[in-house]
Amino acid sequence: VKAEDDTMMDAFKTGEINFLSQLSEGDQINTALDMAETGEFNYCHYTRNGYGKLMFQCDGGPTQFQAVRQAVAYLLDREEFATTFTGGYGSVVHGPYSTAQWMYQDSEEFFNDNLNNYSYDPAKAVEVLEADGWTLDAEGNEYSGTGLRYKEVTAEEAGDYALNVTLADGRILMPLHIMWASSENNPVS
């Protein structure tokens, strides 16, 4: 029987199910540990071989530009996110691997020393965007600090991105508007 996330703890308490695995949300883990403290249940702690990720479609729109992807990374407080989601039971990794995987364990020092961990830094996000040309408004004037940022792009860079603006002088401006998608039935989506 597969337990549903919103009822699995009650089903476990009542004996409807007798095993829980792969708990990753802090509230679930705390509830399970509280139940184990009563002595009625046992638990086994292990490093979970899983991870979450943010993925970009990089063949068009603003995310084709490395600076935009970097700015998004600087705007995510990944430490706070991991702590909030896992209740302090998770950690941040800087690539598509988990701390349970041997290749991470064998290379943890190298990863920590050589990969940019993109610590939360909104000022750095703005700096990266401005250096890449995201300095205009929708009319092609200097960005004032409110509304969307735009960048002048070539026709090739513009592609078929539906939100581009073509000015009377023929310049093409791309708005810094990212079309997001997310997985369903996910507490962080």
Regions of interest found by a model, annotated:
Residues 1-60, 71, 79, 83-88, ...:
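Extracellular/periplasmic solute-recognition and catalytic clefts
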Residues 31-32, 187-189:
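Short, polar/charged alpha-helical segment
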Residues 64-188:
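Append "and occasionally in soluble cytosolic enzymes with long acidic Gly/Pro-rich linkers
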